[in-house]
């Protein structure tokens, strides 16, 4: 019989539970989530249904134990041995009993046999009987992540039925029925880890067995996760077709954009593969792809394919009639709900009290550390997996990019705050694994201890954090003084926390024989410098005002030293660039005038094309940094007096230097780089537009920004609006020129336009182009 213990919710609140399904009365009354209890105790000697035929009235069990609803009327019965040996395993991966079970599983999967449930009717005998639970198809995914338990091994000669199938039955894929039906040994494995979900046991022991869908899996795999059967592409359902379309769109669109500064493709290639088995990743990808798809819809494929004929997976039926915004909201809400539930079971209360579970995967322990939950928890009815820390990081990065698509400031900041906290927490666990007394190859001291997934997520979050701080005129969340964190991400710094030249072999920028492409490291180094520059700009606008020339002198001298230090590091970075960061082709303005028919003003700029997209985008960011650096140079002295002529000459020289960098930013965009470069060029183009005064040049910047949003769906209208308002303030007479260029901002937030301090350069050498 079952020992009724009540649901977990009532047990935690110390309430009496009536165990009503699916929600007990106490939980329904208080509007709480009713979580069934996984604890089941079998006491067959106390059940009246176990009385044998020869049992007398004195020996038989009384009516007190004869529960009417102990077993269902349709329960199936099979003979089991009276003597059962329970074996307690301490190591699931090395225990001989489990290894033997794996062999049996492999044998049964290699030679599947047809199976029909109605054949079990002939197995019922008059001896001792016990009902065997059957696994319903709806609970197969919930039973997958189990890991611990008891093995039953006993010779059973009675289980040798003749298994046959009807002639008309068709088996579409290999099916393995329960092990007890094919082997003389019963191998019952019920696994339960402290970080996995326990399925509902009531339905587990009552629902009929779906033999056509059930397939047992080996339990000795390093990562205990259920692998769903691969469906036939010809019988995809509508939802599966939609998911397939969104997965491919993400790989060619947002995922490819996130991989711009990564050698190879991680988000575009590896993450969709993981999403096949990870519902959390799948819904996150679907939400991001649906949002991007809703903003472009009737466009040709993002990359590859044909514009005249598309694959069936890409062609979604009735695209104009589909409410993609609603689908985006559904996928997003599902992802956030699953993410919060996963985080509640993953993150410990404090770094000192947290537990770190080290699971070796592919020989690299750094790839698979997990923060274990304090107690078993059922995540949800549709969640049958325990996501790893890396998978949670990837999901958070995708959600941040989801908000970055249309620059939803409030939600974007929330995700960035969570991403920063989770990155730091995971990095602390990486640090804790580096024990000083473990001098072995498994615990290296280099930054390679961090996994590729962690690095890919870190640099994506670092770029978004820098851009969010630039847009909102605030400081970044990531601390540039935490050198250990940045070194974990691969940044090469010397003892003085300064960058090293990328082409100086004496500094060991790349280890000998290392196959890593250094362009990725160079691009990431510029992100670190940009973070320092944005923080420098944010601090300069909030300096507390104190009376006294002495205090003002200290503040200005300190900021002046910081500015020169930043300028020196940018110069070191630029002087060490390899040839790959130079334009592979450049077209002078005189050669482009005859080719442009509709927009003759485009011939005012030289076009520069880079063969490596990451280098093109990085150079645009560098030119943007030089503009910001010049415009935020502090005064050398607050008491120094200059004539108006010198001041005017100085401002003109600064504007000329900034316009040189602005034209280079525009020239790279005019060369029509791929969409990944274009979506990352919004902020450089906006910065360049602030330095322009010619109406024709301004029109080009507006056209480039609008084309980015129309072609990719990336939000640029808020920057267009800010540029138009700024140009109207500078030239009130030109309001008619920009009247047709104004566009409404669909966001509720008003984005602050960066304001820069007036700068002064000492001599003309500061104005040279870097």
Swiss-Prot record:
It is found in: Nucleus. GO terms for cellular component: nucleus. Induction: Expression is up-regulated more than 10 fold in toxin producing cultures. InterPro entries: Fun_TF (IPR021858), Zn2-C6_fun-type_DNA-bd_sf (IPR036864), Zn2Cys6_DnaBD (IPR001138). One of its GO terms (biological process) is positive regulation of transcription by RNA polymerase II. One of its GO terms (molecular function) is DNA-binding transcription factor activity, RNA polymerase II-specific. The keyword Kinase does not apply. Pfam families: Fungal_trans_2, Zn_clus. Transcription factor that regulates the expression of the gene clusters that mediate the biosynthesis of AM-toxins, host-selective toxins (HSTs) causing Alternaria blotch on apple, a worldwide distributed disease. AM-toxins have two target sites for affecting susceptible apple cells; they cause invagination of the plasma membrane and electrolyte loss and chloroplast disorganization. Gene clusters encoding host-selective toxins (HSTs) are localized on conditionally dispensable chromosomes (CDCs), also called supernumerary chromosomes, where they are present in multiple copies. The CDCs are not essential for saprophytic growth but controls host-selective pathogenicity. This is Transcription activator AMTR1. It comes from Alternaria alternata. The lineage of its organism: Eukaryota, Fungi, Dikarya, Ascomycota, Pezizomycotina.
């Amino acid at each position: 019989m079952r020992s009724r213990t009540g649901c977990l919710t009532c047990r935690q609140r110390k309430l009496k539970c009536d165990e009503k399904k699916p929600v007990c009365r106490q939980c329904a009354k208080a509007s709480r989530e009713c979580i069934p209890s996984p604890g089941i105790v079998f006491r067959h000697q106390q059940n009246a249904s176990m009385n044998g035929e020869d049992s007398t009235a004195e020996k038989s069990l009384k009516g007190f134990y004869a529960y009417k609803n102990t077993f269902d009327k349709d329960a199936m019965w099979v003979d089991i041995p009276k003597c059962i040996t329970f074996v307690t395993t301490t190591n699931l991966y090395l225990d001989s009993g489990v290894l033997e079970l794996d062999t049996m599983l492999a044998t049964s999967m290699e030679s599947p046999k047809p199976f029909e449930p109605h054949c079990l009717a002939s197995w019922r005998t008059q001896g001792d009987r016990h009902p065997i639970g059957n696994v319903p198809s709806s609970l197969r995914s919930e039973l997958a992540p189990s890991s611990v338990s008891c093995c039953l091994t006993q010779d059973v000669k009675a289980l040798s039925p003749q298994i046959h199938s009807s002639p008309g039955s068709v088996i579409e894929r290999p099916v393995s029925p329960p092990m007890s039906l094919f082997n003389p040994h019963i191998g019952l494995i019920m696994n339960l880890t402290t970080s996995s979900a326990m399925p509902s046991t009531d339905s587990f022991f009552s629902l009929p067995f779906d033999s056509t869908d059930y397939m047992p899996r080996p339990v000795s795999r390093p990562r205990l996760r259920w692998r769903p059967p691969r469906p036939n592409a010809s019988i995809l359902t509508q939802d599966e077709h939609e998911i397939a379309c969104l997965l491919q769109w993400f790989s060619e669109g947002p995922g490819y954009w996130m991989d711009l500064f990564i050698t190879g493709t991680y988000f575009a290639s590896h993450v969709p593969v993981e999403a096949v088995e990870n519902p959390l990743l799948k819904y996150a990808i679907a939400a991001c792809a649906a949002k991007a798809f809703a903003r472009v819809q009737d466009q040709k494929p993002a990359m590859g394919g044909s514009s005249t004929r598309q694959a069936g997976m890409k062609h979604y039926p009735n695209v104009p009639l589909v409410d993609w915004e609603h689908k985006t909201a559904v996928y997003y809400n599902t992802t956030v709900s699953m993410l919060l539930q996963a985080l509640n079971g993953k993150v410990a209360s404090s770094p000192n009290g947290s537990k770190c579970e080290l699971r070796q995967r592919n020989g690299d322990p750094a790839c698979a550390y997990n923060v274990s939950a304090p107690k078993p928890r059922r995540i949800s009815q549709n969640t049958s997996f325990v996501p790893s820390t890396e998978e949670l990081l990837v999901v958070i990065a995708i959600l941040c990019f989801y908000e970055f698509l249309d620059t939803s400031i409030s939600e974007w900041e929330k995700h960035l705050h969570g991403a920063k906290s989770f990155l730091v927490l995971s990095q602390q666990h990486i640090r804790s694994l580096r024990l000083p007394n473990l001098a072995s190859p498994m615990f290296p001291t280099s930054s390679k201890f961090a996994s590729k997934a962690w690095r890919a997520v870190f640099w994506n979050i670092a770029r978004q954090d820098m851009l969010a701080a630039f847009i909102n005129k605030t400081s970044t969340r990531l601390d540039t003084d935490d050198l250990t964190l940045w070194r974990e991400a691969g940044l090469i710094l010397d003892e003085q926390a300064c960058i090293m030249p990328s082409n100086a072999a004496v500094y060991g920028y790349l280890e000998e024989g290392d196959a890593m492409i250094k362009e990725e490291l160079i691009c990431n180094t510029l992100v670190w410098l940009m973070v320092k520059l944005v923080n420098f700009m944010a601090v300069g606008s909030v300096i507390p005002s104190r009376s006294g020339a002495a205090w003002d002198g200290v503040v200005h001298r300190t900021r002046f030293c910081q500015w020169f230090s930043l300028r020196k590091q940018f110069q070191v970075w630029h002087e060490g660039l390899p040839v790959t960061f130079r334009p592979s082709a450049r077209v002078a303005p005189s050669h482009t005038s005859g080719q442009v028919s509709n927009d003759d003003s485009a011939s005012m700029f030289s076009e520069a094309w880079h063969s490596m997209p990451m280098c093109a985008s990085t150079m645009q960011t560098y030119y943007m940094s030089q503009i910001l650096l010049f415009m935020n140079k502090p005064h050398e002295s607050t008491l120094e007096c200059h004539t108006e002529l010198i001041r005017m000459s100085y401002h003109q020289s600064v504007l000329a230097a900034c316009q040189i960098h602005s034209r280079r930013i525009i020239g790279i965009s005019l060369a029509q780089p791929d969409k990944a470069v274009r979506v990352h060029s919004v902020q450089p183009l906006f910065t360049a537009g602030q330095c322009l005064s010619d109406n024709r040049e301004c029109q080009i910047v507006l056209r480039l920004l609008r084309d980015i949003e129309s072609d990719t769906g990336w939000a640029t209208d808020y920057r267009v609006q800010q540029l138009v308002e700024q140009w109207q303030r500078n030239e009130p007479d030109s309001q008619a020129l920009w009247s047709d260029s104004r566009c409404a901002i669909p966001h509720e937030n008003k984005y602050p336009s960066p304001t820069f301090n007036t700068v002064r350069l000492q001599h003309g050498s500061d104005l040279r182009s870097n």
